[in-house]
Amino acid sequence: MRTAELKRETKETKIDIQLNLDGTGESSIQTGVGFFDHMLTLLAFHSQMDLHVKVEGDTWVDAHHTVEDVGIALGQLIVKSLGDKVGIRRYGSSYMPMDETLARAVIDVSGRPFLVYQADIRNPKLGDFDTELAEEFFRAVAMNGRLTLHLAVLYGSNSHHMIEGLFKAFGRALAEAVSSDGTNRLPSTKGWIEG
């Protein structure tokens, strides 16, 4: 099984996180940021990975450190759980409708971290979650997971639906990218993938 866990402690956050890429979508999420908990639960469900996250963060400041540090930790666990990347599809994509919104995620498990994020989120805040933190989370996952990640809200008007669509699309695309391609080879003509 492709699993990994991490305990990460800084002066801003204390994180205990476990990931199973070959799970069933089971999750237990406690970040102290309600909307973010909801998004991570959706991510686990739609990627079919098991994700357990417990965070003690400086949320009295704001949610930035918590959200970014969870992204860093999740990215590191993706790298660790994938190991040598032999036999994975490498690429994944998903379109996700959410009522009036259409979101898209495209992933390359390339070893070359890059994020393109195109989402005009209208509300600056959803509950205790600053909507700009969605981009910070995905950047942290992409950089630390060594993923090329393109995310876009193609259209929509409801900020909750837009961010939810991105998390769900990312989950589906990630599930495809890390799934087996039925071979025992590295998915690169170079014979090498960084990270």
From Swiss-Prot:
It is an enzyme of class 4 (lyase). It comes from the Bacteria. It catalyses: D-erythro-1-(imidazol-4-yl)glycerol 3-phosphate = 3-(imidazol-4-yl)-2-oxopropyl phosphate + H2O. One of its GO terms (cellular component) is cytoplasm. One of its GO terms (biological process) is L-histidine biosynthetic process. Keywords: Amino-acid biosynthesis, Cytoplasm, Histidine biosynthesis, Lyase. It is found in: Cytoplasm. Its EC number is 4.2.1.19. InterPro entries: IGPD_sf (IPR038494), ImidazoleglycerolP_deHydtase (IPR000807), ImidazoleglycerP_deHydtase_CS (IPR020565), Ribosomal_Su5_D2-typ_SF (IPR020568). One of its GO terms (molecular function) is imidazoleglycerol-phosphate dehydratase activity. Pathway: Amino-acid biosynthesis; L-histidine biosynthesis; L-histidine from 5-phospho-alpha-D-ribose 1-diphosphate: step 6/9. Belongs to the imidazoleglycerol-phosphate dehydratase family. This is Imidazoleglycerol-phosphate dehydratase. It comes from Exiguobacterium sp. (strain ATCC BAA-1283 / AT1b).
